[in-house]
Swiss-Prot record:
Coiled coil: none annotated. The keyword Cytoplasm applies. SUPFAM superfamilies: GroEL apical domain-like, GroEL equatorial domain-like, GroEL-intermediate domain like. This is Chaperonin GroEL 2. GO terms for biological process: protein refolding. The keyword Isomerase applies.
Amino acid sequence: MAKQIAFDEQARRALERGVNQLADAVKVTLGPRGRHVVLDKQFGGPQVTNDGVTIAREIELEDPYENLGAQLAKNVATKTNDVAGDGTTTATVLAQAMVREGLRNLAAGANPTALGRGIQAATDAVVDALKAKATPVKGRDNIAQIATVSSRDESIGALVGEAMERVGEDGVISIEESSTLATELEITEGVQFDKGFVSPYFVTDSERQEAVLEDAQILLHREKISSIQDLLPLLEKIAQSGKPLLILAEDVEGEALSTLVVNAIRKTFKVVAVKAPYFGDRRKAFLDDLAAVTGAQVIAPEVGLKLSEAGPEVLGSARRITVTKDTTTIVDGRGPQDDVKARAEQIRKEIEVSDSDWDREKLQERLAKLAGGVAVIKVGAATETELKERKSRIEDAVAASKAAAEEGSVPGGGSSLIHAAKELNGDLGLSGDEATGVRLVRTALEAPLFWIASNAGQEGAVVVSKVRDLDWGQGYNAATLTFGDLVQPGIVDPLKVTRSAVANAASIARMVLTTESAVVDKPEEEDSAAAGHGHGHSH
């Protein structure tokens, strides 16, 4: 495939045009009075959204050089979304401002490498200033404020606040589509996983088609159980205690299963067999997690335990177990709390060192199952389009709340960036083009507030200069069009979101400024034209 190459100013200007087109499409959504963007989808109806990253992902430009710039800006949005789950529009607007200021300085003869060093130094100083001023976010009301600002909806804020309070910071909050108009919260406490009973004969409540075991014992087995001889000694001892039993194994089959079914039908004693979820190492790890939660010991050859020799001491217990055809929920496992805490700590360490997003996500799920319950927010709306838009806002609100619980919050509305920029007033003691890089960042940090005010119909530059004279924690409330304290009315952003936006924007700006050439595929000529050429060259 032949390539086309653009050099110097021509390449950088094309990249800037691409960044601008993407940022201009996204920035209309910024702030409480921001607008929506309608996306034409290849399948299904159009999508209405005010989520920066959703818009960015849809944008492909016709001009290949400009498209490179748009993809770089898209990178800022997706990277910020991956790290913090929100703040993608802020990051894109910052990147646009830094690229614009930087290219102006390059045109005036600045050295791109020195500019880059200045940008990096300024970014580090701003991030440190934000970290130093961040306030921890604790309690339902604070979380609800963060979620309300993110979703622009108090009812969503309250729902997310309640969900976080009920399942804890590490708890799973899953978001599903509801078939009703209402958006509501469901909590399942304890450990839930997606495997149900092996046979419907285990059902104890035929109306609801579920098996409920109260004050139950739990047998965890790493391999298949097919011989009843292996299981009999243990079953006899359990039958004497009169307590119901949950058997969780790779599989329960053959005569072992038929004997258990006969026992269940005759009501000799209550028993339910369930296949262990997942495969391989994930299944092994999950069984070990359950062992910690329930106080059981996993029966496996590698720990020298055989089913035929196991006594009641290997069993775990729980206050209540509910098994349906698809799910099993274990409530109030009776394992020692210290074991559960140690197990959770171990998973947290694994999350820190993991470099695979998929692994991290699965580890987070395991941690959530251990640490808290599972909250399900069921999203309802009148139309499919509204449902998707609402679901997207709730996802952002949950991500923002988790980010805030992790690292704390800073005043929102673009104000903390203006105040943090005051740290750069002495150019950080740098000189020459490095100092220019610092000043460039100081100017760019005004962009989010400028557009929040502009989208509210105000004069952006006037609002920025007024906020500059205020103290930390004060700024412009675009919802009420007033200046004053932002923390009291709950206009706060997660530190993680704000810091990621600044760092990712600076990273892309440095790349664009140090670009000296851009290489793209040459568009192929029409087939008819191609047919007339090229035949005389083969000798």
